[in-house]
Swiss-Prot record:
It comes from the Bacteria. Coiled coil: none annotated. Belongs to the UPF0126 family. This is UPF0126 membrane protein HI_1240. The lineage of its organism: Bacteria, Pseudomonadati, Pseudomonadota, Gammaproteobacteria, Pasteurellales. Keywords: Cell membrane, Membrane, Transmembrane, Transmembrane helix. It is found in: Cell membrane. InterPro entries: Gly_transporter. Pfam families: Gly_transporter.
Length: 220
C-alpha cells in the first residue's frame, strides 16, 4: 500500500518534469504526453521487456498512464502561469524526483526478486527502473542523458537496490525494509544534490591531425 501511494506520487511528478522537458523543446501536446509517459513509466517498461515480465506495468494498470497523461496536460496549461515561481517548484520536483528514484528502484528490485533472479539481475532491474525513464527522455529530446554526466543518480538507484535486497535477505518486515531503504537512499540523494557529489568524469579529447603534427617526434 505504501509503495503504491509513493509510486503514484512519483509517476505524477515525473510526468510533470517530462512535460516541462518537452516544452523546452517546443513539442506539441502529443509529444508532451509521450515524453511525460516515457519519463514516468519508461524505465519500468524497459525492465519488464528485458525480464520477460508481462503484461507491462502500465498495460496491467492503464490508470497509471492516464495519471501521467493528465499530469502532462495540466502542466502544459499551468506552467506558463507559474513561470515566475518555477525556482520554488524546481526544488519540490527535485525532492519528489529523489523519492521517485528510490521507489522505482525498490519496485524494480522486488519484481526481479519475485522472479527468482540473482543479485546481479536484481541490481540491473533496480537501476533500469529507477534511472532509464530519464535516459529515454533525454535521448528523445536529443540530449546526452543527465544520468551519464557525473551526477549521482543511477548510483543512488544501485544503492537503494542493494539496501532493499540486503534487508529483504535478512527477512526484515516488508514495510520496514521499504521505509529504511527510502530514508537512507532519499537522504543520500538530497545530500548529493546539495553538496554536488558526483562520479569521476572521463574527459578524453582526441588530437586533431594538426595537433598531432605539432607533437615532437619520439625517437625509438
Amino acid at each position: 500500500m505504501l509503495l503504491s501511494i509513493l509510486y503514484i506520487i512519483g509517476i505524477t511528478a515525473e510526468g510533470m518534469t517530462g512535460a516541462l522537458a518537452a516544452g523546452r523543446e517546443k513539442m506539441d501536446i502529443f509529444g508532451v504526453i509521450i515524453i511525460a509517459s516515457v519519463t514516468a513509466i519508461g524505465g519500468g517498461s524497459v525492465r519488464d521487456v528485458l525480464l520477460g515480465h508481462y503484461p507491462l506495468g502500465w498495460v496491467k494498470h492503464p490508470e497509471y498512464f492516464l495519471m501521467v497523461a493528465s499530469a502532462a496536460v495540466i502542466t502544459v496549461y499551468v506552467a506558463p502561469f507559474i513561470n515566475h515561481f518555477m525556482r520554488y517548484f524546481r526544488t519540490i520536483f527535485l525532492v519528489l524526483d529523489a523519492m521517485g528514484l528510490v521507489v522505482y528502484s525498490i519496485i524494480g528490485a522486488q519484481i526481479a526478486m519475485d522472479m527468482g533472479h540473482s543479485l546481479t539481475i536484481v541490481c540491473i532491474a533496480g537501476c533500469i527502473t529507477g534511472a532509464f525513464g530519464g535516459v529515454l527522455r533525454d535521448m528523445l529530446c536529443n540530449r546526452i542523458p543527465l544520468v551519464f554526466q557525473k551526477e549521482l543518480y543511477a548510483s543512488i538507484a544501485l544503492f537503494a537496490t542493494l539496501t532493499y535486497y540486503a534487508l529483504s535477505t535478512l527477512q526484515v518486515e516488508h514495510t520496514l525494509a521499504v521505509l529504511l531503504t527510502l530514508i537512507n537512499s532519499f537522504t543520500l540523494r538530497l545530500l548529493a544534490i546539495h553538496f554536488e557529489w558526483g562520479l569521476p568524469v572521463f574527459n578524453y579529447q582526441e588530437l586533431t591531425s594538426e595537433e598531432q603534427d605539432k607533437q615532437p617526434n619520439k625517437k625509438k
